[in-house]
Amino acid sequence: MKWVWALLLLAALGSGRAERDCRVSSFRVKENFDKARFSGTWYAMAKKDPEGLFLQDNIVAEFSVDETGQMSATAKGRVRLLNNWDVCADMVGTFTDTEDPAKFKMKYWGVASFLQKGNDDHWIVDTDYDTYAVQYSCRLLNLDGTCADSYSFVFSRDPNGLPPEAQKIVRQRQEELCLARQYRLIVHNGYCDGRSERNLL
């Protein structure tokens, strides 16, 4: 009888793993993503950090779509250099379309040379366009198809945060990305609002 319970336990564990496929190729993205509706100002509320030096808090991104339909973005935020020097810095990104309207290749660079630059996948996992958005990027795959170096942002249209119903959806998307409890909250305290030139890069 013990072996029956052992088989049942293994089956339960197996089904649990099946429900949570952490291969990047299995992750869902926003269906019929609309770049025009997504454009405008987004405030980063939470972030799963990658390797390297990126904007750390007070992050505000502005997405736009030109007359040819190409999406681009600028972002401003605080960066700490040498463990004790806080500056506000800008990053710029341009997006190349793929066959999936919610999956882009994003070429990005910092206006200041110390910030990261690269050409990463940029996926819009989910958004309602008016309240929340979840972005995901995997920069390096493991041999088993899971991600070795990823980053992800939770965005809000409101700098004061997300309403409870949106928070619930976001938590579900974080689980689906196998990134639950790996995000840190992003502060918005006005540090980069109207800073003097000596604090801007």
Swiss-Prot record:
Expressed in which tissues: Detected in blood plasma and in urine (at protein level).
Subcellular location: Secreted
Any single GO CC term annotated in Swiss-Prot or TrEMBL for this entry: extracellular space
Pfam families: Lipocalin
Superkingdom in the source lineage: Eukaryota
Keywords: Disease variant, Disulfide bond, Methylation, Microphthalmia, Retinol-binding, Secreted, Sensory transduction, Signal, Transport, Vision, Vitamin A
Entry-annotated residues carrying Omega-N-methylarginine: 139
Disulfide bonds: 22-178, 88-192, 138-147
Molecular-function annotations in GO: molecular carrier activity; protein-containing complex binding; retinal binding; retinol binding; retinol transmembrane transporter activity
Keyword Cell membrane attached: no
Residues annotated as binding substrate: 116
InterPro entries named in the record: Calycin, Lipocalin_ApoD, Lipocalin_CS, Lipocln_cytosolic_FA-bd_dom, Retinol-bd/Purpurin
Record flagged with keyword Disulfide bond: yes
Signal peptide bounds: 1-18
Single biological process term from Gene Ontology: retinal metabolic process
Record's function text: Retinol-binding protein that mediates retinol transport in blood plasma. Delivers retinol from the liver stores to the peripheral tissues. Transfers the bound all-trans retinol to STRA6, that then facilitates retinol transport across the cell membrane.
Similarity remark: Belongs to the calycin superfamily. Lipocalin family.
Subunit and partners: Interacts with TTR. Interaction with TTR prevents its loss by filtration through the kidney glomeruli. Interacts with STRA6.
Disease: Retinal dystrophy, iris coloboma, and comedogenic acne syndrome: A disease characterized by retinal degeneration, ocular colobomas involving both the anterior and posterior segment, impaired night vision and loss of visual acuity. Additional characteristic features include developmental abnormalities and severe acne.
Record's protein name: Retinol-binding protein 4
Gene: RBP4
